[in-house]
């Protein structure tokens, strides 16, 4: 017996593997710029015969240029972030959102829930001779509205209850 020799190729047509498609072909990277449609092929002679039998040139096809975005154009937008202001029973220094000036707020006192609860409590305790209306004279029991001294806009309210 003879020793087995080197491997030999199988008989028949040899198949050479082809390379896979490129990334651009697979994903379509250039999909941002659509390719114009291919022109329709004309007759092989290059001349088209008209209704009167005379030869005419084939129509020419024009493609529109693809717009290229300007890489140098940068839009700059300034954003101002204003911190939320906490309103209490004292004036607040702030920038007015209406007139855009730096101001110290003016205060206005109004009867709120704490004022009415105090009045009702005093009435139940027996202060019916007008003493139950004392909370309407005490600023510490009323709600506080903050106004801009320039444009008189209401900026915020401090509610005690």
From Swiss-Prot:
Localization in the cell: Cytoplasm; Nucleus; Lysosome membrane; Early endosome membrane
Sequence motif PPxY motif, residues: 20-23
Any one GO molecular-function label of the UniProt entry: identical protein binding
Residue ranges, annotated region (Membrane-binding amphipathic helix): 111-134
Role: Plays a role in endosomal protein trafficking and in targeting proteins for lysosomal degradation. Plays a role in targeting endocytosed EGFR and ERGG3 for lysosomal degradation, and thereby helps down-regulate downstream signaling cascades. Helps recruit the ESCRT complex components TSG101, HGS and STAM to cytoplasmic membranes. Probably plays a role in regulating protein degradation via its interaction with NEDD4. May also contribute to the regulation of gene expression in the nucleus.
Observed phenotype of the null mutant: No visible phenotype. Mice are born at the expected Mendelian rate and are fertile. Mutant mice display altered responses to nerve crush injury, with higher numbers of macrophages in injured nerves five days after nerve crush injury, but at later time points macrophage numbers in injured nerves are normal. Bone marrow-derived macrophages from mutant mice display increased migration in response to CCL3, but not in the absence of CCL3. Mutant mice show dramatically increased survival in response to a dose of lipopolysaccharide (LPS) that causes rapid death of 40% of wild-type mice.
Binding site for Zn(2+): 96, 99, 148, 151
Membrane topology of this protein: Peripheral membrane protein
Domain LITAF: 76-160
Tissue spec. comment: Detected in brain, heart, lung, liver, spleen and bone marrow. Detected in myelinating Schwann cells in sciatic nerve and in bone marrow-derived macrophages (at protein level). Widely expressed. Highly expressed in liver.
Full protein name: Lipopolysaccharide-induced tumor necrosis factor-alpha factor homolog
Subunit note: Monomer. Interacts with NEDD4. Interacts (via PSAP motif) with TSG101, a component of the ESCRT-I complex (endosomal sorting complex required for transport I). Interacts with WWOX. Interacts with STAM, a component of the ESCRT-0 complex; the interaction is direct. Identified in a complex with STAM and HGS; within this complex, interacts directly with STAM, but not with HGS. Interacts with STAT6.
GO biological process, any: response to lipopolysaccharide
Stated family: Belongs to the CDIP1/LITAF family.
Transmembrane domains' residue ranges: none
Gene Ontology CC, one term: nucleoplasm
Entry's induction text: Up-regulated in macrophages exposed to lipopolysaccharide (LPS) (at protein level). By estrogen and lipopolysaccharides (LPS).
Ion transport recorded as keyword: no
Recorded coiled-coil stretches: none
């Amino acid at each position: 017996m003879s020793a087995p020799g080197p491997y030999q190729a199988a008989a028949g047509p040899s198949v050479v593997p082809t390379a896979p498609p490129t990334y651009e072909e697979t994903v379509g990277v250039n999909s941002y710029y659509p390719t114009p449609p291919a022109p329709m092929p004309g007759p092989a002679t290059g001349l088209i015969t008209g209704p009167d039998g005379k030869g005419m040139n084939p129509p020419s096809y024009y493609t529109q240029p693809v717009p290229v975005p300007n890489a140098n154009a940068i839009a700059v937008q300034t954003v101002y972030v204003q911190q939320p202001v906490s309103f209490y029973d004292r004036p607040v220094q702030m920038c007015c959102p209406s007139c855009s000036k730096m101001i110290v707020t003016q205060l206005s006192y109004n009867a709120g829930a704490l004022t009415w609860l105090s009045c009702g409590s005093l009435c139940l305790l027996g202060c019916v001779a007008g003493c139950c209306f004392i909370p309407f004279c005490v600023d510490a029991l009323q709600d506080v509205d903050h106004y801009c001294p320039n444009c008189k806009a209401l900026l915020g309210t401090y509610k005690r209850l």
